[in-house]
């Protein structure tokens, strides 16, 4: 699939995930701003992909990126950040979300694995309760 074909809306990604799950595939979800893509992002996403058959990456929309990163951010607009992340071999599906966290995305996709960066502990993951809600 081309990188442009990997970027889709949450409802479309949910359909793709359901089809993959129906085929016995494990689903991982990673999320972040991914502004000024760097090697740490690549390592995070490659590590996430190693945990499942299908990797979905949820990217913060510009407004939520600005709320998280501060004024002047993001440098790169969300559609371009999505396209950059989609161009990586390790990603299967990419979506843009406009909430402060990915609880809604987690509830919609119910991934087998929700992957966060090393700056979080299990206790400090904002979406912890959303993951625990479906097991």
Predicted segments, located by residue:
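Nucleotidyltransferase catalytic core that binds NTPs
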Residues: 1-135
């Amino acid at each position: 699939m081309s990188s442009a074909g990997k970027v889709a809306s949450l409802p479309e990604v949910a359909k793709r995930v359901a089809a993959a799950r129906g085929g016995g595939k494990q689903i991982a979800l990673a999320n972040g701003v991914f502004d000024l893509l760097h090697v740490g992002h690549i390592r995070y996403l490659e590590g996430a992909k190693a945990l499942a058959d299908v990797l979905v990456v949820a990217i913060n929309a510009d407004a939520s990126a600005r709320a998280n990163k501060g004024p002047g951010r993001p440098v790169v607009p969300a559609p371009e950040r999505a396209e950059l992340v989609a161009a990586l071999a390790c990603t299967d599906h990419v979506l843009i979300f406009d909430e402060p966290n990915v609880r809604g995305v987690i509830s919609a996709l119910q991934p087998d694995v929700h992957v966060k960066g090393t700056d979080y502990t299990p206790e400090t993951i904002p979406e912890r309760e959303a993951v625990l809600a479906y097991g």
